[in-house]
Amino acid sequence: SSLENSRSGNEIVRYEVSTGVRKVVVSANQLTPMGKDKSLAISDYIWSDDNSKLLVFTNTRKVWRYNTRGDYWVLTMKDGKLTQLGKGLDEASLMFAKFSPDGSYVAYVSKQNIYSEELATGVITQLTMDGGNHIINGTFDWVYEEELDDRDGFRWSPDGKNIAYWHFNTAGV
């Protein structure tokens, strides 16, 4: 699939390789939050492993060199429900959101802490509590981004029960 602009906003489309026929998989209308008249301006997106959900990255902000902070939304394909993640967290503060292997959760970083959000209920669980000025969880500092091209510092376990992550204490650095 690919992201294309239309008169009404961003659309996600697929092309049949043999015929070149274009099919809109997700319309701009489906990407319009309830009560709004404009669709989300998508910077990036990823499908869940079973293609039943779409994770959309929007409203992005730069951290060091790249737009890695922003807002994330999930579109459930079965019922067309569009839900913003991270309710109660600061606008454009989420980073590196990713589906759990079974697609029932999304984990992300906000203000140097890692969170997990259950998609069926919207319940958000803060997994790390010590993130702040000198403690970084689930992402990297400037040196890692600049010298090693590392930005995203956490991964789901294959069974989706755990998250492995980088933890840095930059005090005195």
Q: What do the predicted segments below correspond to?
A:
Residues 1-173:
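Beta-propeller folds
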